[in-house]
């Protein structure tokens, strides 16, 4: 589970004399770029991230929000929030989790293959007065949970971690705990690179390996907007906009491209420089390590070198993201 903390504690790193100096990832809550793009480009990508979508843009038919910012806004666009989504399901006779069958339109259609229950729908409406597609949870679905919106700040550095780095985390964790805690690095499809896989690191279940895959998945499932990577609607009821909804603009980029570039350019969460020097904070840091919190919530990671191809060869790590040390205090593995 990829949980990037809302703030980051920077540790003093004792480097061996022969090791090359590590470059710290830019951190802050000022909404500026981490150096990946210039200010005008970052502002343009931010505008796309904050844009409120309408039905004419492809919003729905089922959706949770009308913009990325609606769920990712604290303390700046790209941050976390207390906005949550509902996931449900049930266990079969063998105890395995199964997704629900959700009936809509008075039983005329069944939505299968996903645990997400969308909060909103675009109909009934003036155009479709008798079509009822709002999702409701059947009594059969006993497994229910709310998941809050995750922080996106610093995710460009998370994407730039090598798969091997995350595999090594899993091995080291299991070794250090003598088999008591053995998180998994899960390989998942890279949607923009058919046939290729990478270690998942985005989403509550590490279900996405790249920020472009993540953008397309969220655009469809949270806003109901299709794209070249996710061209199929969850339901076509009440749908009057051609697919894919997300079409390239004058610059040749689709919204999902702008979203991915925006997230890649976000600074890492900043440390509270004053608070970190207090006796209480220093004592807490010692306890965090001593009781084993750091076993899962990793304090310091370093991205792959610039020039490294990732995401099935569809993205090459630029200088702004390559060879950068950051301090996520996050758990990047799946746990049973």
Role assignments for model-derived ranges:
Residues 17-336:
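Periplasmic c-type cytochrome electron-transfer domains
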Residues 1-4:
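Positively charged n-region of N-terminal signal peptides that target proteins for export
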Residues 6-16:
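Bacterial N-terminal signal peptides
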């Amino acid at each position: 589970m990829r949980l990037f903390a809302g703030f980051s504690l920077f540790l003093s790193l004792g480097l061996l004399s022969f090791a090359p100096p590590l470059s710290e990832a830019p951190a802050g809550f000022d909404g500026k770029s981490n150096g990946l793009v210039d200010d005008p480009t970052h502002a343009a990508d931010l505008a796309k991230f904050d844009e409120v979508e309408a039905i004419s843009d492809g919003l729905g038919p089922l959706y949770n929000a009308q913009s990325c910012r609606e769920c990712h806004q604290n303390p700046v666009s790209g941050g976390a929030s207390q906005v949550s989504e509902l996931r449900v399901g049930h266990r079969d006779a063998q105890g395995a989790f199964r997704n629900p069958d959700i009936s809509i339109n008075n039983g005329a259609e069944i939505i299968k293959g996903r645990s997400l229950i969308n909060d909103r729908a675009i109909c009934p409406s003036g155009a479709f007065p008798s079509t009822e597609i709002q999702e409701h949870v059947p009594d059969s679905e006993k497994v229910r949970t709310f998941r809050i919106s995750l922080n996106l700040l610093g995710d460009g550095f998370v994407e730039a971690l090598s798969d091997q780095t995350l595999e090594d985390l899993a091995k080291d964790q299991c070794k250090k705990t003598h088999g008591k805690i053995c998180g998994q690095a899960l390989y998942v499809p890279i949607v923009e690179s058919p046939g290729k896989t990478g270690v998942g690191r985005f989403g509550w279940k590490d279900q996405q390996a790249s920020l472009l895959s993540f953008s397309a998945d969220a655009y469809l499932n949270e806003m109901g907007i299709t794209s070249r990577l996710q061209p199929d609607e969850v339901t076509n009821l009440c749908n009057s906009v051609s697919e894919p909804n997300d079409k390239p603009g004058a610059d040749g980029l689709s919204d999902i491209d702008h979203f991915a570039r925006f997230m890649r350019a976000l600074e890492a969460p900043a440390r509270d420089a004053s608070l970190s020097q207090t006796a209480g904070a220093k004592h807490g840091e010692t306890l965090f390590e001593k009781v084993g919190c750091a076993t899962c919530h990793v304090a310091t990671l370093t991205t792959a070198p610039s020039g490294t191809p990732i995401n099935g060869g569809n993205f090459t790590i630029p200088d702004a993201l390559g060879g950068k040390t950051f301090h996520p205090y996050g758990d990047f593995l799946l746990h049973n």
